[in-house]
């Protein structure tokens, strides 16, 4: 049987069995539903999009997958080049993986090893946010702060190497004053904390984080697995405040295939580019850079560019603001719109 996510299988309701999907709609044998969650915020172009379908079909006729260990291929190379040209600053170096959680793990390994490669082994700490969610693997559980997901493993997910603070500039300044010489990175879901409760905060917090990271030589990591590709009204929050490492996932392939990217700037990359073998990043998911996933991602990005998605997002925002004004039911505590 299928072991379903985030469910007590003994008491869960029978899930809807989907037999078809098209556009915003999911179909069971006798029902048509709007997928308002976009399969956990990933299906940004709708289901069964002909452009992405064709990109995958064209690639599968050549090959579906070869590892990137000792081999390479055009779809992975083109996607890394596209992301480098699309992203701000010198975020040019793409490490691919097969899920957002793993991509955040890679970012945390990069940040820690960056300093270890320099001989600075005291920088073992991560500064993260209260109510953060960065994934379900053990290190991302440590960096996260959401008991709704990891309450049973709370004792094992806690770490002396992670400090959580509220999204307040005074708390940020105090944390740097106390820990700055032990921090390797500040890890945030920028502007919007998704799974932790759709909590929003001001970009001024990120600008201060960038300033303090520069002042004290700490890396700034943006987890834009959920917030990327227009979710905040910007293509990426990285367009507003430039991180040292950016993590992308979910919508990267238009929701077609699990794939993610950990994108580093030149400074971070050069911390690994060395004659010393031990300074290499020792991480390698089997399906990193999967050719079908990369082809889907390239088609998805092309759609995002050619169909003026940022204007579409502005129109959706305007409609949402207008319609949400009528939400006055006493059971509704707060309406949040970005």
Stretches with model-predicted labels:
Residues 1-338:
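Conserved N-terminal phosphate-binding loop of PLP-dependent enzymes in the Aspartate aminotransferase
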């Amino acid at each position: 049987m299928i072991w379903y996510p985030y469910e007590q299988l003994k008491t869960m309701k029978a899930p809807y069995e989907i037999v078809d999907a098209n556009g915003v709609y999911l179909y069971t044998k006798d029902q048509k539903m709007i997928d308002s969650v976009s399969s956990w915020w990933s299906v940004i172009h709708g289901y069964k999009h002909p452009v992405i379908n064709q990109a995958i079909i064209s690639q599968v006729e050549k090959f579906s997958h070869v590892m990137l260990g000792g081999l390479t291929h055009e779809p992975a190379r083109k996607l890394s080049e596209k992301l480098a040209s699309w992203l701000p600053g010198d975020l040019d170096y793409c490490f691919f993986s097969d899920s957002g959680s793993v991509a955040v793990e890679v970012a945390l390994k990069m940040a820690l090893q960056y300093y270890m490669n320099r001989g600075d082994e005291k920088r073992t700490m991560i500064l993260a946010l209260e109510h953060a969610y960065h994934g379900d693997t053990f290190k991302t559980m440590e960096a996260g702060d959401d008991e709704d997901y990891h309450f049973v493993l709370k004792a094992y997910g806690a770490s002396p190497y992670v400090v959580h603070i509220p999204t307040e500039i005074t708390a940020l300044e105090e944390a740097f004053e106390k820990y700055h010489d032990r921090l390797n990175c500040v890890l945030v879901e920028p502007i919007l904390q998704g799974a932790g409760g759709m909590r929003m905060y001001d970009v001024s917090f990120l600008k201060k984080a960038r300033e303090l990271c520069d002042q004290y030589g700490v890396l700034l990591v943006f987890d834009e697995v959920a917030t990327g590709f227009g979710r905040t009204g910007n293509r990426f929050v990285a367009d507003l405040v430039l991180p040292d490492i950016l993590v992308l996932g979910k919508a990267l392939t238009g929701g077609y295939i699990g794939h993610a990217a950990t994108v580093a700037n030149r400074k971070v990359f050069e911390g690994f580019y060395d004659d010393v073998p031990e300074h290499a990043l020792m991480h390698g998911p089997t399906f990193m850079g999967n050719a079908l996933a990369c082809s889907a991602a390239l088609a998805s990005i092309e759609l995002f560019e050619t169909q003026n998605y940022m204007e579409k997002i502005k129109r959706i925002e305007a409609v949402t603001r207008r319609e949400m004004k009528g939400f006055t039911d006493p059971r509704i505590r707060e309406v949040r719109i970005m």
